[in-house]
């Protein structure tokens, strides 16, 4: 009987690997070049966000949400402020809702541009990130013009948004959409028909519908399996039920499908943005952008100069903060990476008793072993790129 040398390797992927999307360490067990087991070691970016939020007032806890999925910060803020508003029973004025939806969709573009182009870079294409980041830069400037910050915005507040948008900014966002769609078409023509990109992504990381549900997938990962599950349609929040848009779904549930869905989602986001811009410039041109309940939303500076009550409200809000009625609430939004949920438990004080953040990337990373098993080592990077992971939210 001939002697066969079986070469079993254990290798470390990361935590400083350029394709690891942050501080991910994966211990891979290989048989030759075939992956037999993947063990993701997470927690290298753990900052104790949930516990920190429990020591702060509701207003002070807001900025922590920006630091989770820092690619699309306002989408995480959205879930938190909706949860606080649900506890308080506060209604956000229509103009405030439209501004929130507009910036949530800008966040979706920011996220998908980064993911699609870096997914291409992970398999060897170097041009897409340069093209994609040019568009991201323009969107970052919209963030900056709305609230002064490019990344950690803290723009969504309980009761509405921090400040109104100037009309010229809304017009500029409207003028951005058509050139963006042209640029997206160029990116599409560059990557989608590319032979090498297809060979690296088609039939890689396939997952069935039942497996996807069982593993807690959401967002693009579940839609890739052919399920039209999108919280903006199935459990509408804000004014998404008044918007016209389609939900792209996949057929083969592989990495290539997930890429195609993200590309189409960007077009749908642009469609939603256009509807928001049109309404903000016509029917909802005037009106408040946040609730007028001064016990929750701080009064305007001009009001404080001649009203003692306004001054008192302002002082109380920024020292003690508002109290929420006791109870518990779970609110989920369709973040770019999937279902981002915030579970709040209130004990009637000015601070949350317990905050639980449900990060979509956390559930998706746990499936890495299942998705990669039996594939080649080089496919692990393609699969990791397609599940869209940011470590701020995975490790929290």
From Swiss-Prot:
EC numbers, comma separated: 7.1.1.-
Pfam families linked to this entry: Complex1_49kDa
Compartments where found: Cell inner membrane
Catalytic activity line of the entry: a quinone + NADH + 5 H(+)(in) = a quinol + NAD(+) + 4 H(+)(out)
Membrane topology: Peripheral membrane protein
SUPFAM superfamilies in UniProt: HydB/Nqo4-like
Domain of life: Bacteria
Cross-referenced InterPro entries: NADH_Q_OxRdtase_suD, NADH_UbQ_OxRdtase_49kDa_CS, NDH1_su_D/H, NiFe-Hase_large
Keyword check for Cell inner membrane: yes
Family to which this protein belongs: Belongs to the complex I 49 kDa subunit family.
NCBIfam families on file: NuoD (TIGR01962), PRK06075.1 (NF004739)
Purpose: NDH-1 shuttles electrons from NADH, via FMN and iron-sulfur (Fe-S) centers, to quinones in the respiratory chain. The immediate electron acceptor for the enzyme in this species is believed to be ubiquinone. Couples the redox reaction to proton translocation (for every two electrons transferred, four hydrogen ions are translocated across the cytoplasmic membrane), and thus conserves the redox energy in a proton gradient.
Protein's UniProt name: NADH-quinone oxidoreductase subunit D
Record organism: Bartonella bacilliformis (strain ATCC 35685 / KC583 / Herrer 020/F12,63)
Lineage of source species: Bacteria, Pseudomonadati, Pseudomonadota, Alphaproteobacteria, Hyphomicrobiales
């Amino acid at each position: 009987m001939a002697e066969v040398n079986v070469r079993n390797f254990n290798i470390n992927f990361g935590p400083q690997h350029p394709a690891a999307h942050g501080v991910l360490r994966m211990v891979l067990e290989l048989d030759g070049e075939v992956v037999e087991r993947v063990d993701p070691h997470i927690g290298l970016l753990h900052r104790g966000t949930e516990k920190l939020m429990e020591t702060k007032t509701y207003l002070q806890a807001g900025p922590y949400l920006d630091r989770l999925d820092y690619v699309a910060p306002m989408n995480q803020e959205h879930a938190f402020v909706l949860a606080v508003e649900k506890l308080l029973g506060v209604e956000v004025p229509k103009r405030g809702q439209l501004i929130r939806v507009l910036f949530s969709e800008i966040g979706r573009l920011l996220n998908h541009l980064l993911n699609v182009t870096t997914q291409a870079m992970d398999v060897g294409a170097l041009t897409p990130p340069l093209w994609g980041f040019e568009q991201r830069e323009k969107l970052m400037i919209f963030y900056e013009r709305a609230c002064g910050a490019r990344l950690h915005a803290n723009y969504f507040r309980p009761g509405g948004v921090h400040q109104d948008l100037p009309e010229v900014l809304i017009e500029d966002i409207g003028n951005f959409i058509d050139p963006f769609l042209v640029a997206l078409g160029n990116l599409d023509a560059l990557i989608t028909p590319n032979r090498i990109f297809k060979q690296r992504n088609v039939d890689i990381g396939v997952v069935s519908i039942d497996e996807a549900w069982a593993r807690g997938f959401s967002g693009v990962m579940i839609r890739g399996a052919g399920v039209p599950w999108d919280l903006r349609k199935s459990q509408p929040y804000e004014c998404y039920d008044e918007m016209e848009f389609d939900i792209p779904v996949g057929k083969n549930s592989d990495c290539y499908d997930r890429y195609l869905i993200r590309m189409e989602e960007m077009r749908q986001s642009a469609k939603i943005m256009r509807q928001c811009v049109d309404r903000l410039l016509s029917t909802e041109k005037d009106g408040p952008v946040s609730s007028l309940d001064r016990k929750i939303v701080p009064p305007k500076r001009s009001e404080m100069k001649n009203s003692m009550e306004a001054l008192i409200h302002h002082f109380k809000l920024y020292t003690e903060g508002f109290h929420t009625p006791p109870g518990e609430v779970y609110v989920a939004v369709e973040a770019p990476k999937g279902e981002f949920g915030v579970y709040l438990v209130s004990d009637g004080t000015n601070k949350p008793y317990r905050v639980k953040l449900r990060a979509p990337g956390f559930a998706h990373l746990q499936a890495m072993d299942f998705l990669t098993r039996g594939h080649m080592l080089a496919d692990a990077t393609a699969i990791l790129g397609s599940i869209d992971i940011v470590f701020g939210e995975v490790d929290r």
